[in-house]
Amino acid sequence: MLFRSQATFRIVNYPKFFTPNGDGYNDTWNISEIASDQPEAYIYIFDRYGKLLKQISVIGEGWDGTLNGLTLPSTDYWFRVFYKENGESKEFKSHFSLKR
């Protein structure tokens, strides 16, 4: 008999806020903790109206809170993470806050 173990991947720990003020702490937003398990995962970041602001990779530096070089306001932003689990495409959605 052959038993296959299938690992389930969950995104439970992501930054709930970031503070892009140039102090070197929490200046960018990303879910880099999943990079070791999901290096090909990517993230779309949206404003409250659903406008796409940025696409980032989990292995990149993250989002700095700007759009076309302009700083965006302190508010909530939404994201969608696309990744693979057991060869199947999956999606995770949630939100975070930008605080200035």
Regions found by a protein language model. Give the residues of each.
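Short, small-residue-biased leader/transition segments that mark boundaries at the very start
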Residues: 1-2
